[in-house]
Amino acid sequence: MAAPHHLMPLPREDPVSWLTTSGTAGGSFAPTEAAAYFFDRLASMSVGLDSGFRRISTTSARLAVPRVLSDAVANWTAEGTEITPTDPNADVVTAVPRKLAALTYASNELVDDSQPDAQDVLATNLARAVALKLDWSFFEGSGTAPEIRGLKNQSGIQTLSMGANGAALTNLDPFADALGMLAEEDAEGTAIVMHPRNWRALTKIKETSGSAKPVLVDGAGAPTEGPRRSIQGVPVWLTSQLSTTETQGSATTANSIYVYQADQVCAVIRADADVKVDKSAAFSSDRTAVRVTLRADEVLPNPAAVVRILGVLPA
């Protein structure tokens, strides 16, 4: 699994000093360091970003990402003869970053009287809210404005069905099939993302009937990393943001698992997270407002580098 980001320590002066600079109420109170720190924390909490999505930063409202549909062809050529030219078939996919926002209020008593850890609580709360919604959007987003389009609704990805009415995981065959499907498209499986209930079911599968030895176990990992999970050497990430109410035939409690080459999934970020504080918005209730906005989109330059295993039922 990719190593987690090393978080920059918070300043330890005034409880919200990381959010405040000189200026008038309603202006931008977040220095560049605070926005960068916030995005680092967000990235470490987002399964999509942490799994290795290729991050592309832009300052434009739209970004064209090249996509090769078929490669140029090489041929053995006799000495002195013309080389037959071939051109790759290519087009572009256009990313249109859309706004994801979170807003929270803190009482001025909390801001004024709490220990310095209050700033850490606010930062963590907002980062977690944005990261969870970002992950939901990366995998489940409909593409209907203002939502971005997630992997589930991207055209051109590969699919592997667990059957007409779905099925629970009883072995690792679906993952072997998914990794094989990627290899057949000259892609490499570098990440597997599933709902926690799927991993729970997998860890209960035993090597043989009557055996108590599980097929999969969590690796210990370093204390700062948490458990290491993998299937056939491919890192596994868990997120609760995958739907568990998909319909597969007569089943209505299915979910999907995604196996992909992470650098073929592009997270396009329109500038950094923007953090603002305003003491006037909730003047009548004596509270301070903290707002975070982020503009992002997701595009696939090679959709075949993603396999969706659909129709996975609870064990």
Name each region found by the language model.
Residues 118-123, 205-208, 249-250, 282, ...:
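Composition- and surface-driven signal marking solvent-exposed, interaction-prone regions
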Residues 2-102, 147, 171, 305:
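Assembly/oligomerization interface modules of large self-assembling protein complexes
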Residues 69-74, 101, 110, 132, ...:
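Short loop/turn segments at secondary-structure transitions that flank enzyme active sites
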Residues 59, 64, 144-284, 288, ...:
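Extended oligomerization regions of viral-like shell subunits
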Residues 73-77, 86, 113-115, 201-204, ...:
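Short helix/loop capping segments that flank catalytic or ligand/cofactor-binding pockets
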Residues 282-315:
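Hydrophobic, glycine-enriched assembly/anchoring segments
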Residues 82-184, 308-315:
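Alpha-helical scaffold segments that mediate packing/assembly in large oligomeric complexes
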Residues 67, 100-106, 238, 292:
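Short amphipathic
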